[in-house]
């Protein structure tokens, strides 16, 4: 079939398998060009490995450090008549490229919050790898099914305390609007912490640890975003921020546990990037379009892959073997360039000036749109989008 982009809200409902494969190839090429990570991990589990920072982590481990990887994700395969999710095609492409280089690659398509997922991963590790030396936790899900009761809990992207009103961009109509978001209830805040906080990360490490499959010196990292006052009402000071603070709590507890065997647990605070997750957060697309333009001008721009490669090579797995630099809360900070005062001041000054008419001139909004559509495999140079393509792509994946 011939597949064209169809956008609904902040999701593109179609995906292009060849385009998704090209995205993965591009990240692999970038990783290889940067060179091998001297003290990199060798047996890595990535929970949430099909897109965004999780996918880049799997690529950094495999193609930057020759690591065996297990990826866990929840994606939909395509059929003969309907495309699957981008994450399915990303994972299929990763598996193909990893195997072509003789690297161990196993993927599990399942609910990562479930007990079954954890048991299956443990079984695989015992069978094939013995133990693992890194666990990346990179889940971004709006809903969590509690593993014991089966109850479905939903997260809320809302402020706390008062209604939040701010200038934003309507990405469907490409115009500047005033976005208003009502505050979260106490229940919504608690639910957001349940879905997006640190509990499941702890459950993963507990299960792996009790099964005896964590190597001494095993490192685990979970990803977070803090941002600045421009996005704080909806993010760090909102329901989502409470969940990310719970991630900090979990990191502290896990670090105490893992340090006994020379391991570590950290939250890595990353920069804002165009992902399916960030596009769903009010105000983020406009902020990203603004900050990207300034960072590009300053020569500081990083996408998911550049950011993760820097985390691996300059923080977690330094050539000199030293421990990573952390902030007062033991977080690894990779938002350091984005938070530079000149860059943030630029955004603060620009925010009130942006109109529908000057949006593309003052910000990198056009590039934002191009990167967004690229997440789904579209708008990539060298791909013939009028060519017939088969949306049914099979690969070595365990379905639970």
From Swiss-Prot:
- Classification via InterPro entries: Eno_Rdtase_FAD-bd_dom, Enoyl-CoA_Rdtase_cat_dom, FabV-like_NADH_b, Trans-2-enoyl-CoA_reductase
Biological pathway: Lipid metabolism; fatty acid biosynthesis
Record EC number: 1.3.1.9
Its catalytic activity? a 2,3-saturated acyl-[ACP] + NAD(+) = a (2E)-enoyl-[ACP] + NADH + H(+)
Disulfide links within the chain: none
Q: Which Gene3D superfamilies match?
A: NAD(P)-binding Rossmann-like Domain (3.40.50.720)
The catalytic residues are 235
Q: Please list the GO biological process terms of this entry.
A: fatty acid biosynthetic process
* A Pfam family annotated for this UniProt entry: Enoyl_reductase
Top-level lineage group: Bacteria
Task: Provide the site residues for: Plays an important role in discriminating NADH against NADPH.
Answer: 75
Name the keywords, alphabetized. Fatty acid biosynthesis, Fatty acid metabolism, Lipid biosynthesis, Lipid metabolism, NAD, Oxidoreductase
Binding-site positions, NAD(+):
48-53, 74-75, 111-112, 139-140, 244, 273-275
Q: Where are the transmembrane segments?
A: none
One GO molecular function term? Answer: enoyl-[acyl-carrier-protein] reductase (NADH) activity
Does this UniProt record's set of keywords contain Ribosomal protein?
no
User: Which residues hold substrate?
Assistant: 225
Family of the protein in this entry: Belongs to the TER reductase family.
Give the protein's biological function. Answer: Involved in the final reduction of the elongation cycle of fatty acid synthesis (FAS II). Catalyzes the reduction of a carbon-carbon double bond in an enoyl moiety that is covalently linked to an acyl carrier protein (ACP).
Instruction: Give the quaternary structure.
Output: Monomer.
The record ties this protein, via HAMAP family, to: FabV_reductase
Q: What is this protein called?
A: Enoyl-[acyl-carrier-protein] reductase [NADH]
